[in-house]
Structure formats: structure tokens, C-alpha cells
Amino acid sequence: MEYKSNQHRQMAKVKNILSQIFFPKRLESYSHESYSGSCGAHAQWSLNPENGELRITGTGPLYDFFGEKEVPWESHLNHIRKVVAHGITYIGFQTFSYCKSLSSVQLPDTLTGIGQHAFAYCKSLPSVLLPEGVKHIKDYAFAHCYHLQELTLPTTLKSIGKAAFCSCHGLN
């Protein structure tokens, strides 16, 4: 009985706090979606919803996104048209996979590796220029990029993982 009484008091406090939030009269909509945040220990992202440009800045590797760790721009996957990255060293597991509208990627010269499935199913991506310094491309990194027609590999490349470019029908 004591538990329910405490629970009711807590709910009353929450209702009181929420009743003190005032929104401007001209506010037409409110979204809980995020357009910026963290994507690595020292890396941040921001998305311009107007033009679909996703900017990644910072240093070091991006997170690997699997299991409990979801891609922070998950709700915007279909709207991302361009990725511009600065300062990062590694693109993690599934970082940009399923960005079906992605048509342009600018990767930094600090990049040394591309993780598994990093760009998998980016069906609109026509070309990729991997900068000098990239040493490793992991399994399925660009798998199912059906429109990928142009790929420039760096001289620093040491390994290409299994099926890294499978179902990239535009590559000869």
C-alpha cells in the first residue's frame, strides 16, 4: 500500500512539472528527433535536414553500430544525401548502411579503415574516392551498392575483406 502511495505522489510531481511548460503560440510542430550528437568517443555528427548533408567531425574512430548501439541518425537514413567527414580515422560497423539516398561521400585523409557493412545497401552511391592512408576495408563494406560505378583505391591499401564489393553491379 505504501508503494502505491509513493507512486501516486511521484506522478503528481511529474504532472505538476509538466504543467509548467509553456510553448510559444506560433509553434506549429515539435519533434523529438535529433539532428546532432556523438558518434565516437571524440566524434560528433550533425544533419542538415534541408539538404540531407550529414557532417562528421572530430578525431579517432567512429563507433561500431550493432546490438544495443543504434546508428544515431537511424530515423533519417532515407534523407541522408551527402556525407562529409573530417578528422576521423575509422568508419565503424554499419555506420552508413541503408542510407538509400546517399549519393556523395567526402572522406578525410586521416581515414585508415572502413568497417564491416559500413556503406552496405547505399543504393544511390555512384562513386567513392578512398583517400591515401586507408589500409583496410572490412567484409561487406560496400556490399549491395548497386549503382556504384567508380571506385578509386589508395596505394596504401593492405587488405580488402570478404565480399566487400559484392552486388556492386556497376563495377567492372
Predicted features by range, described:
Residues E33-Y35, H42-Q44, V71-W73, L107, ...:
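Short, flexible coil/linker segments at or flanking structured domains
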Residues Y35-G37, S97, A120, A143, ...:
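Secreted/extracellular small peptides and ectodomain modules produced from precursors
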Residues H8, I21-F22, G52-G60, L77-Y90, ...:
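Structural signature of tandem-repeat unit edges
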Residues A43, D64-F66, Y121, D139, ...:
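Residues at secondary-structure transition points
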Residues M1, M11, K25-L27, Q116, ...:
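A subset of signal/propeptide-processing and intrinsically disordered low-complexity segments
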Residues M1-Q94, D109:
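N-terminal capping/linker segments that flank leucine-rich repeat
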Residues G92-T95, G115-A118, K138-A141, G161-A164:
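Consensus positions within tandem repeat domains that build extended binding/scaffold surfaces
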Residues K15, K25-L27, K100, A120-K123:
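Compositionally biased, low-complexity segments
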